[in-house]
Amino acid sequence: MAKKVVGEIKLQIAATKANPSPPVGPALGQQGVNIMEFCKAFNERTKDMAGFNIPVVITVYADKSFTFITKQPPATDLIKKAAGISKGADNPLKNKVGKLTKAQVLEIVDKKIADMNTKDREQAAKIIMGSARSMGVEIVD
């Protein structure tokens, strides 16, 4: 028989930087999860994704055990890294803060497509390009 699920927690945590302080500690503590066990497992699983915030979905069971799924970093983080910028434009219609090539967009799509709501590479590229434009990043050929 399957374990009874008592909760699901969604967080964004910096890769390899999970620790018992807020927001991780309080969110897991309310469900009775062993916080240090989660932190060690998360940090181990994300050691090759350093520098990104990683979305994680933690499923908590009635016996206080847990499983978690890490997803790819948010598209905005991938765009900022590829464009070499620290933040998006304050007025993206007037100010352009960086440039991305179509090849860089497709590279981001290949990393991100598993977490997107489309499996079509061209549609996923349009979504990423729209996110880039809304950040003030110009798409060039």
From Swiss-Prot:
Citing just one GO molecular function, the answer is: structural constituent of ribosome
Q: Which GO terms describe its biological process?
A: translation
Report keywords, A-Z. Methylation, Ribonucleoprotein, Ribosomal protein, RNA-binding, rRNA-binding
The answer on whether this UniProt entry bears the keyword rRNA-binding reads: yes
Q: Which domain of life is it from?
A: Bacteria
- Task performed by this protein: Forms part of the ribosomal stalk which helps the ribosome interact with GTP-bound translation factors.
Alphabetized HAMAP family for the sequence: Ribosomal_uL11
- Designated name of the protein: Large ribosomal subunit protein uL11
